[in-house]
Amino acid sequence: METLANRLDACQETLLELYEKDSNKLEDQIKHWAQVRLENVMLFKARECGMTRVGCTTVPALTVSKAKACQAIEVQLALQTLMQSAYSTEAWTLRDTCLEMWDAPPKKCWKKKGLSVLVKFDGSSDRDMIYTGWHHIYVQDANDDTWHKVPGKVDELGLYYEHDGVRVNYVDFGTESLTYGVTGTWEVHVAGRVIHHTSASVSSTQATASDDEPLSPIRLAVSPVPAPASAASARTGTAPPTNLLCTAPAPPSPPAKRQRVIVGQQHLRPDSTRTVGEGQVECYDKRSISNTNSTAPRWDHGDTDTVPVIHLRGDANCLKCFRYRVQKHKDKLYDRVSSTWHWAGGKCDKTAFVTVWYTSVEQRKEFLTRVNIPKGVIALPGYMSAFV
């Protein structure tokens, strides 16, 4: 016990010295990950022996120590192969060689000098996303484990780099538009420039900016797009505005799966003519649900004292995160949202609910069209009395 505590203290002391040193040498970063690996190996062994504390250090669960040790081994081996390359003399800091940088897109590559790329889906500021492009990307060859330094690029289709003449995308704007957009159009803003795109301008060869073009530190691959000049620009000789809307190409997609919405104990299938995207839920504008044993409707919501709602059922933490995420859509896509609630009494479980209140059925349909329901959460459309 005392020997293990002394060895763990020495390991942690070495880590503190490396943090204070803040070196930019690759060999120090390799040493850092070797110590992280050793620390988690000792914590793993301590937990196996039934210890919960070693000195002042709390011993985590076996799975936690094992996962961190495996991550440290992976990063250490990658840095050791990088040490044998021509880029070992470059400056490598703790930030450059951290696990988050290793796992950031493109994964299993080293990256330097990030650049923010703003994408406005549907041309709306309410649906913009910020992605990180990289000036320099260090790619390891799968055949001989050698490292190659390639420039990061961005065009109207996504963020990518080229290695051995092959384009490798690590962010596909077309795929992202299925999640964050509706119309399949977007604008790409990078370094004060807007990359223009129309579906007719997509080709297999993209014109890339040369090294001497002062566009931005990250290379832009922009297809020339003919734009009709206005009458004013024709007279003055000025170019038309460059803030154009990007239109997504129509990539081949598999047939969309028909998604079910659970209402009470009934399963309603969307109409076969409607395509429901992944993560979206179809809203049914039905004022009554017919009883299978009677021709009379079960509920009549034609009264003016009822409002459309959706009860979201699922894990409590997931519902809390979802409620926080949709706060920015308040007043536009919904009127109010409840706190997390549970049923009390009877045959109740730990299932949580969140109720979303809408001013109209159309607003509820717009909410379900634009907001992705989290996986594992079931949307239950219905009506409630307008008691407040």
Curated annotation (Swiss-Prot):
GO biological process assignments: DNA replication; DNA-templated transcription; regulation of DNA replication; viral DNA genome replication
Compositional bias (Polar residues): 235-245
Compartment(s) where it occurs, according to its Swiss-Prot or TrEMBL record: Host nucleus
Post-translational modification comment from the UniProt entry: Phosphorylated.
Entry GO terms, CC: host cell nucleus
Pfam families reported for this sequence: PPV_E2_C, PPV_E2_N
Signal peptide: none
Known role: Plays a role in the initiation of viral DNA replication. A dimer of E2 interacts with a dimer of E1 in order to improve specificity of E1 DNA binding activity. Once the complex recognizes and binds DNA at specific sites, the E2 dimer is removed from DNA. E2 also regulates viral transcription through binding to the E2RE response element (5'-ACCNNNNNNGGT-3') present in multiple copies in the regulatory regions of the viral genome. Activates or represses transcription depending on E2RE's position with regards to proximal promoter elements including the TATA-box.
Subunit structure, interactors included: Binds DNA as homodimer. Interacts with protein E1; this interaction greatly increases E1 DNA-binding activity. Interacts with protein L1; this interaction enhances E2-dependent replication and transcription activation. Interacts with protein L2; this interaction inhibits E2 transcriptional activity but not DNA replication function E2. Interacts with protein E7; this interaction inhibits E7 oncogenic activity. Interacts with host TAF1; this interaction modulates E2-dependent transcriptional regulation. Interacts with host BRD4; this interaction mediates E2 transcriptional activation function.
Record's protein name: Regulatory protein E2
